[in-house]
């Protein structure tokens, strides 16, 4: 069934041929890095080691955590796993353990208990006056090791963004600490909070190190690094710069309408990677080196977000079916904890995809909507394939990293008025 209400551009499937940097054997790579780390060899047998895992959809995270657990067991230590999260899992101990379980991390599969609690202890104060909280189970362990992906953050730019330091500061602070830190971030910036709080955590002498994970543009596990506390800041800064150089973008300089099949916490902490869709709490098109996007239509909420629709406020329009899936408690806790309310706001919504497109296209700034440029992607994380409007093709044909793999086709809708899917449903990132 073709699009009947107005004439719009036909779409063509393209593929972005990003370099593939996948590790051949992730578990073996983790083991090798841990065995080569001097700091890991100095931990005495019998030590209780808290292994921290977070809530992001990190590829192979279950394999990585299992390899870390197995390493510590081979050293005759006693590893246990803790969820290192702020408000995620609806800010409850059970919810956070459930998040890990859905990523394949539980006692049965890991061979180590998962100990989840929101209890914290105060471990000091930063020079700026920030009281620093630390997960009680982590503090009472003999040592702590965090498994974290290093990548750009969705809300700010700096030398340290998302990674081991952010997990150490925000995640180990649990809900109580996360609320406090995000409030401070409004005053001194999130990077300042991460560095200050991270420094206090390091001064507890509880941190053993961290396993830094880098993913390529295909979301393959590309590199793993065992970071000791003495060189952690410098090494993480180096790794962040490297992974930023691998970043994928929407394949256009300017887009009138960006369509996403799904948003969700499994794709980004902000639901949508704001440095892909070019949005921030300060408004649209803040980020440099990212395509300018006028309007965003989000079709659905990922099941792996468990009702948390944080970031839906970055969209201009969505469907009733997405709104019906929202767990407002989880969404609003997430927004309030991060001291940002607009990402949790619900945009205008309509019964089906066709109606949403009919309503939003005339707002894209073109007197003739048939001239609106359109890009359709599965989510803000999976950018290898996209559907792009014909008027974008001239700028793409000479790009050696882009391959045109389909013929022009009109948008098609089913009997309920929803787009006939162009992409396979996103798999869980394990």
Residue ranges with predicted function:
Residues 48-57, 80-87, 375:
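Short glycine-rich or small-residue beta-strand-to-loop segments that form or flank ligand, phosphate
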């Amino acid at each position: 069934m073709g699009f009947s209400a107005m004439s719009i551009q036909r779409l063509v499937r393209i593929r972005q041929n990003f370099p593939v940097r996948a590790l051949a054997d992730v578990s073996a790579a983790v083991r090798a890095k841990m065995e080569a780390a001097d700091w890991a060899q100095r931990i005495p047998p019998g030590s209780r080691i808290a292994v921290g895992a977070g809530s992001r959809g990190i590829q192979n995270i279950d394999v990585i955590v299992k390899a870390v657990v197995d390493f510590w067991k081979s050293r005759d230590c006693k590893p246990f796993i803790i969820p290192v999260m702020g408000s995620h899992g609806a800010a409850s101990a059970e919810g956070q353990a459930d998040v890990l379980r859905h990523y394949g991390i539980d006692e049965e599969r890991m061979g180590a208990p998962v100990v989840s609690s929101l209890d914290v202890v105060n471990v000091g104060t930063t020079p700026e006056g920030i009281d620093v909280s630390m997960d009680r189970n982590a503090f009472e362990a003999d040592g702590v090791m965090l498994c974290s992906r290093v990548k750009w953050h969705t809300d700010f730019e700096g030398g340290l963004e998302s990674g081991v330091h952010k997990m150490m500061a925000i995640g180990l602070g649990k809900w109580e600490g996360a609320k406090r830190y995000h409030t401070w971030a409004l005053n001194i910036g999130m990077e300042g909070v991460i560095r200050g709080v991270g420094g206090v955590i390091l001064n507890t002498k509880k941190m053993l190190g961290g396993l830094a994970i880098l993913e390529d543009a295909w979301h393959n596990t590309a590199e793993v690094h065992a970071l000791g506390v003495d060189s952690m800041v410098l090494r993480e800064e180096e790794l962040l710069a490297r992974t930023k150089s691998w970043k994928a973008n929407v394949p256009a300089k300017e887009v009138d309408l960006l369509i996403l099949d799904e948003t969700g916490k499994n794709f980004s902490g902000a639901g949508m990677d704001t440095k892909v869709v070019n949005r921030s709490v300060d408004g649209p098109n803040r980020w440099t080196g990212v395509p300018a996007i006028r309007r965003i239509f989000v079709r659905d909420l990922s099941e792996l977000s468990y009702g948390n629709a944080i970031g839906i406020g970055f969209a201009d329009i969505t469907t009733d079916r997405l709104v019906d899936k929202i767990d407002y408690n989880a969404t609003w806790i997430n927004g309030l904890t991060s001291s940002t309310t607009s990402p949790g706001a619900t945009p205008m919504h309509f019964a089906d995809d066709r109606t949403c497109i009919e309503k939003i296209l005339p707002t894209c700034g073109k007197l003739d909507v048939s001239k609106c440029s359109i890009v359709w992607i599965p989510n803000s994380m999976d950018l290898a394939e996209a559907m792009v409007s014909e008027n974008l093709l001239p700028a793409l044909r000479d790009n050696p990293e882009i391959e045109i793999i389909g013929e022009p086709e009109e948008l098609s809708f089913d009997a309920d008025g929803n787009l006939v899917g162009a992409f396979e449903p996103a798999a869980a990132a394990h």
